[in-house]
Amino acid sequence: MPYRIPRLFISATRKSSGKTFIAVGLTAALSARGLVVQPFKKGPDYIDPRWHSLAAGRECRNLDDFIMGRPKVLTSFVAHAQGADVAIIEGNLGLFDGQDLEGSDSSAALAKALGAPVLLVVDCKHLARSVAPLVCGHLHFPGGETIVGIILNNVATPRQEKRLREAIERFCPIPILGAIPRSAEIMIDERHLGLVPANEKQGAPHTVETMGRMMESHLDLDRLVALAATATPLALPDNPPALASKAPLVGGRPVRVGYAADQAFSFYYPDNLEALRQNGVELVPFSLLDEQPLPQVDGLYIGGGFPEMFMEHLQQNRATLETIRTRSELGMPIYAECGGLMVLSQRLIWAGKRVELAGALPIEITMHPKPQGYGYMKIHGTGALPWPPVDQEICCHEFHYSKVSKLGEGVRFAYQVTRGSGVDGWHDGILYHNIFASYAHIHVEGAPEWAPFLARFWRERGSFSQP
């Protein structure tokens, strides 16, 4: 059955052109008009979706062909866009960028698969008449037929805007749907993993509201809504795959799991948290940055984030770190990814500083100026755990500037890495006592058995990881 979902795909001529700024602002503006907006983000990014979620008032969903597969991407899109007035999808990189020369992994390819009209954002810094061949080139490149309008961003003056409009109107058969003036006061700051997360930026809700008002003033929102409605009905493939995040609720003894949710640890996919809840996991948020005692729980889940930005703060919270180490020594099962792996280590070394951390893992972490693991991964099980099986390939991703510089005795590995870096270039998924910690970020729609396995891991006190 074809699904009628008004939708727009926000892309750009290149990376760092203002896609997120435009997409978040557009989402905020449409939401302020009373529309229900469902945001999506292409790729495995954690940070941009936090801004989209804040603007929409509902969770942004990731769409990633490599990790999830195209059928699951389409199924997830339809499932989460149902009931919304409009879906806003933000691409990544430039419209045609990707690793495949034929463009199968590009934003253009995803937009075409979703049947989504594309708005092309053009960063106009230092541009004048040259904007015309830039836009025309995109329109005539394979995949450019999905572009329905241009948004001029970072426009310095009314005079520049006039020249840009004249050039495009003279040479390019495409409407200009808005021109956003340069405004440093509402730009989202960046750091080594991308934008600063919304939960770290002071006044983030006000920033989003300001972005929304700017889009209301400078974009033709009525025309954009009309263009979204022109999207053709989207048909799913025959026998579409089931979504792990929408699986029926599993019975059995509930298990309480504390998950770190603060400025330092915030990298959690909504789909993953929902899948865990569907498997009987009660998720109890806690912070590693305040001095409140850890909740009484059966296990811990420490996701990724930016612990390196809070080194001294974490070090000062010795009571919480020591409680984590003590509970792990007493058998509490702990699952951690990336930043979580880091905080469980003995110490973190960065720019000559040594910070003592939880010491639950016999490892030492060193930060480097360049990425030590970046991009997509492929992993197999080593046989040390029931999941993942040795003969099953899991597609996931990593992005870390840290590296395990010292590895103590007694450590085993859950994953064999066939693409990517992991801990040592060949292995990932450190197993030590009842701790399971990796650099790999898992998305449940690419690994449906992840959530049932972790629920059993916590429920049975990590017995799977025993030698």
UniProtKB/Swiss-Prot annotation:
<keyword id="KW-0436">Ligase</keyword>
<dbReference type="InterPro" id="IPR029062">
    <property type="entry name" value="Class_I_gatase-like"/>
</dbReference>
<dbReference type="GO" id="GO:0009236">
    <property type="term" value="P:cobalamin biosynthetic process"/>
</dbReference>
<dbReference type="InterPro" id="IPR002586">
    <property type="entry name" value="CobQ/CobB/MinD/ParA_Nub-bd_dom"/>
</dbReference>
<comment type="similarity">
    <text>Belongs to the CobB/CbiA family.</text>
</comment>
<feature type="active site" description="Nucleophile">
    <location>
        <position position="338"/>
    </location>
</feature>
<protein>
    <recommendedName>
        <fullName>Cobyrinate a,c-diamide synthase</fullName>
        <ecNumber>6.3.5.11</ecNumber>
    </recommendedName>
</protein>
<keyword id="KW-0067">ATP-binding</keyword>
<comment type="pathway">
    <text>Cofactor biosynthesis; adenosylcobalamin biosynthesis; cob(II)yrinate a,c-diamide from sirohydrochlorin (anaerobic route): step 10/10.</text>
</comment>
<dbReference type="InterPro" id="IPR011698">
    <property type="entry name" value="GATase_3"/>
</dbReference>
<keyword id="KW-0460">Magnesium</keyword>
<feature type="site" description="Increases nucleophilicity of active site Cys">
    <location>
        <position position="441"/>
    </location>
</feature>
<dbReference type="Pfam" id="PF01656">
    <property type="entry name" value="CbiA"/>
</dbReference>
<feature type="domain" description="GATase cobBQ-type">
    <location>
        <begin position="256"/>
        <end position="449"/>
    </location>
</feature>
<comment type="function">
    <text>Catalyzes the ATP-dependent amidation of the two carboxylate groups at positions a and c of cobyrinate, using either L-glutamine or ammonia as the nitrogen source.</text>
</comment>
<keyword id="KW-0315">Glutamine amidotransferase</keyword>
<keyword id="KW-0169">Cobalamin biosynthesis</keyword>
<dbReference type="InterPro" id="IPR027417">
    <property type="entry name" value="P-loop_NTPase"/>
</dbReference>
<dbReference type="InterPro" id="IPR004484">
    <property type="entry name" value="CbiA/CobB_synth"/>
</dbReference>
<dbReference type="Pfam" id="PF07685">
    <property type="entry name" value="GATase_3"/>
</dbReference>
<keyword id="KW-0547">Nucleotide-binding</keyword>
<dbReference type="GO" id="GO:0005524">
    <property type="term" value="F:ATP binding"/>
</dbReference>
<dbReference type="GO" id="GO:0042242">
    <property type="term" value="F:cobyrinic acid a,c-diamide synthase activity"/>
</dbReference>
